């Protein structure tokens, strides 16, 4: 996270995305340099057809500065940040776009709008946030959930989060993911709710065919470091 190396999307994810090439994507508040660079990369790989939402003058100026030709793409002029989220949610609700991409906008503003039922974007499953990371000298990704969406989730919500991430793993060709239900300890303690939740989640998961190896409670260091787990006698 503190690395100054260029961010590169893993080849295997690009290969999977190839099956969905050219999907229309609403870029929410697209006028800043960072989201525009991401759009450039995505267009270069022919992954999306962007619909650029934001201040039209700023969008065109940023693209021009980056020598990025956006003349073929739809631009919706909306200079007010909060309103860009409304435009994107309506486009998705109406079926005009298949994907909503967060540009230069606060997450809470975007999600507050997307979650409104009037747009019909919410299905039966609870939404959750998934953070996919690739690490140097590692051939397996590290995936963390939920880091940004559900606040103080109970066991029922955590089960939704668990099923969402397992489904995501299966979709990116991880046939049987290893899942750690995190707590600050490996012991089940009455004084630590997260450890009690982890135990209950593992028990519930055993009763369902989730096609994943699920362990918990486990501390984060023991989940990501084999050496750390060995020191604590965890196999």
Region spans (language model):
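Anion-binding alpha/beta catalytic cores of soluble intermediary-metabolism enzymes, centered on
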Residues: 1-52, 56-235
């Amino acid at each position: 996270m503190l690395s100054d190396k260029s961010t590169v999307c893993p080849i295997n994810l690009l290969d999977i995305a190839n099956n969905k090439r050219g999907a229309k994507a609403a870029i929410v508040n697209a006028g800043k340099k960072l989201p525009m660079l991401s759009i450039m990369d995505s267009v270069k790989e022919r992954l999306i057809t962007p619909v650029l939402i934001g201040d039209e003058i700023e969008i065109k100026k940023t693209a021009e500065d980056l020598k990025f030709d956006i003349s073929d793409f739809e631009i919706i002029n909306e200079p007010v940040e909060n309103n860009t989220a409304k435009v994107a949610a309506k486009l998705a609700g109406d079926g005009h776009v298949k994907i909503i991409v967060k540009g230069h906008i606060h997450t809470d503003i975007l999600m507050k709008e997307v979650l409104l039922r009037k747009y019909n974007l919410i299905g039966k499953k609870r939404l959750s946030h998934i953070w996919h990371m690739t690490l140097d000298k590692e051939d397996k990704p590290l995936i963390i959930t939920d880091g940004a969406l559900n606040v103080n989730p109970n066991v029922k919500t955590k089960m939704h989060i668990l099923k969402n991430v397992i489904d995501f793993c299966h979709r990116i060709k991880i046939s049987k993911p290893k899942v750690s239900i995190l707590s600050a300890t490996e012991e089940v303690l009455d004084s630590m709710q997260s450890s009690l939740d982890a135990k209950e989640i593992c028990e519930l998961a055993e009763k369902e065919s989730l096609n994943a190896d699920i362990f918990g409670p486990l501390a984060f260091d023991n989940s990501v470091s084999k050496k750390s787990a060995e020191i604590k006698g965890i196999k």
